[in-house]
Each structure stands twice: as structure tokens, then as C-alpha cells.
């Protein structure tokens, strides 16, 4: 029996394939509620605290929608500037206090490892909404859900492109897809390559890994293209960002060489790495992908609070 009640959601490495599949199954059952076609009171009387120390649109709003669709209430930090953090309060004390107010904490923080550290001081479950450039497990769960709904997971041929050095979404996704025997191609400028330790770990698991600097070389050989933006905020040197920001771009012309069934995903926000003329093609699934964050986060909230087993 899989136990999720009071469990923290910090890294994909904390979950087995069987547990991931179960979470995806629960999300699928909750999708009619996420779409407003059915009503639910699973989180009636529960308070979910959203502690976001970095900007967020989709993650934050989808957690709010997920909570409200399940009948719960949201306790949200308006801004870091308006909080006691600006007075010097440390994260540990903030977590201790918010644990007294809420039944679960969703934390986004710029420091690597901050979510794991928060669990040491929390009296309630903590869900990692993204910490530094390392982990973003709820994004990975929704990416897996999207791939399963739009294509398939087992033996998937996928390319991840863009900022593979700083992109926490691709780091988490690599591990998760390795559980399904995916074939992975990494496309990026040399400066933004996938970290070598991740590539080594994948190859130790006998996962087929290729690397390229050119989308044209690989576009006809893949089933899913996972595109990411170059993350300007992670660059210590702005000039280095300027050198690489426009190196990779998906256009309608490029897609003429793609498999007709190719699906394009993007964790959003995008900058200019996907041309607007791609949006109305059958390949573009990134807006539906953003919606899938709602049923996935509903499932994670319900399971960790313990209203679903």
C-alpha cells in the first residue's frame, strides 16, 4: 500500500515509478473537477499556505485554483517585501510560524535545497514549488501527465532544448523519464549543456542519451520536444546571457521536417524561443500543459493532506 498522508513533495527522486503512476491516475480522476464540470469538497476546512519568494504565475495560480476547486482556502504571502523576511526573519522561523496557521505549505524559494531544509522545521507537509535551479517536482508531475495524455511515457523519444544548465524543470524531468526508459536528446549551446553529473547518472542507468547544438538535426527523430527559455535571472554575467539568448528557436518552417505527431511542450513563460506561428499548429500543447497543472496539484494536495488514499 502506498502512503502519501503527511508526506513532503520535495524531489522526484523521492518517488517510485509506481507512486508516480498512482498520482497521475488520481489527477486523471480529478480532471473533471479541475475543469469545473464536477464539484468537490475534499479540502473543506483545510488551509493551504503559498509561500513564494520568487515570481510565479502558473505554479502559484494553479495551486490556488486546485485548492479552491477542492473546497479549501488559500493563505498567501502577498509579497516578500511586505513580510517579516524584510526585517531579517529567517526561513526556518517563517516555516515554523506558518505551520501553525495552515494544513500544508507550498514553498518556492531561490536557494538550492531550501525546500528540503524547510521540512526540518515544518509541522505540516511541504510541497516544493521550485527551489533554486535544482528541483521543481510539481512541474515534472504535470509534464509527465501531459506526456501521458498527449503521447506515451514508456520508451518515449524526447528532446529537451534551451537552457539545460539552469533549468530545474529539465533536471527533474530527466530523472522521472529515466524510470520509463525514455530516449533523451539534449539540445543547447555549449554554455548551457545539461550538467555532466545528470548525463553520467542517466548513462549509468543505460538510458540512451544524445547531445546536439541544433534543432534541425533532431526534429524528425523525436516524439516530444520539451522547449525551455534561457533563464536570464540565473546568469551571474548579463553579457553571457546576451550571447546565448537567441541560439535556439522553433518556427513553423522548422516543423515541416517534424513527425506529424510531434508534441511541443514548454513549462512557460516563453520569451522568443517558440515563434507565435507555432501556437495554432497541432504540435503545440504547452497551453493545455499549463492547465494540467491544476489536476496534478489537486492530486498532490489531496494525497499529502490525506483526504484521498
Swiss-Prot record:
The gene is pyrB. It catalyses: carbamoyl phosphate + L-aspartate = N-carbamoyl-L-aspartate + phosphate + H(+). It comes from Methanosarcina mazei (strain ATCC BAA-159 / DSM 3647 / Goe1 / Go1 / JCM 11833 / OCM 88). InterPro entries: Asp/Orn_carbamoyltranf_P-bd, Asp/Orn_carbamoylTrfase, Asp/Orn_carbamoylTrfase_sf, Asp_carbamoyltransf, Asp_carbamoyltransf_Asp/Orn-bd. Carbamoyl phosphate binds at residues 58-59, 108, 136, 139, 268-269. Its EC number is 2.1.3.2. L-aspartate binds at residues 87, 168, 229. GO terms for molecular function: amino acid binding; aspartate carbamoyltransferase activity. Catalyzes the condensation of carbamoyl phosphate and aspartate to form carbamoyl aspartate and inorganic phosphate, the committed step in the de novo pyrimidine nucleotide biosynthesis pathway. This is Aspartate carbamoyltransferase catalytic subunit.
Amino acid at each position: 500500500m502506498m502512503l502519501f498522508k503527511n508526506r513532503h513533495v520535495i524531489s522526484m527522486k523521492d518517488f517510485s515509478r509506481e507512486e508516480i503512476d498512482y498520482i497521475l491516475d488520481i489527477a486523471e480522476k480529478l480532471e473533471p473537477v479541475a475543469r469545473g464540470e464536477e464539484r468537490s469538497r475534499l479540502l473543506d476546512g483545510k488551509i493551504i499556505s503559498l509561500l513564494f519568494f520568487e515570481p510565479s504565475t502558473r505554479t502559484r495560480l494553479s495551486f490556488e485554483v486546485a485548492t479552491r476547486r477542492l473546497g479549501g482556502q488559500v493563505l498567501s504571502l502577498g509579497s516578500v517585501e511586505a513580510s517579516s523576511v524584510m526585517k531579517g526573519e529567517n526561513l526556518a522561523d517563517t516555516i515554523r510560524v506558518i505551520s501553525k496557521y495552515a494544513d500544508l505549505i507550498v514553498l518556492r524559494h531561490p536557494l538550492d535545497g531550501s525546500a528540503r531544509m524547510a521540512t526540518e522545521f515544518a509541522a505540516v507537509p511541504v510541497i516544493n514549488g521550485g527551489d533554486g535551479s535544482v528541483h521543481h517536482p510539481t512541474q515534472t508531475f504535470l509534464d509527465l501527465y501531459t506526456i501521458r495524455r498527449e503521447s506515451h511515457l514508456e520508451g518515449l523519444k524526447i528532446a529537451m532544448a534551451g537552457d539545460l544548465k539552469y533549468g530545474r524543470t529539465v533536471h527533474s524531468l530527466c530523472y522521472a523519464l529515466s524510470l520509463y526508459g525514455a530516449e533523451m536528446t539534449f539540445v543547447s549551446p555549449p554554455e548551457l549543456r545539461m550538467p555532466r553529473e545528470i548525463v553520467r547518472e542517466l548513462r549509468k542507468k543505460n538510458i540512451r542519451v544524445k547531445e546536439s547544438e541544433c534543432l534541425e538535426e533532431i526534429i524528425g527523430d523525436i516524439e516530444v520536444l520539451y522547449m525551455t527559455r534561457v533563464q536570464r535571472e540565473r546568469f551571474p554575467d548579463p553579457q553571457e546571457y546576451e550571447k546565448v539568448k537567441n541560439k535556439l528557436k522553433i518556427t513553423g518552417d522548422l516543423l515541416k521536417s517534424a513527425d506529424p505527431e510531434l508534441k511541443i511542450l514548454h513549462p512557460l513563460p516563453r520569451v522568443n524561443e517558440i515563434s507565435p506561428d507555432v501556437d495554432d499548429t497541432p504540435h503545440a500543447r504547452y497551453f493545455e500543459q499549463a492547465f494540467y497543472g491544476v489536476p496534478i496539484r489537486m492530486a498532490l494536495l489531496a494525497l499529502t493532506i490525506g483526504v484521498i488514499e
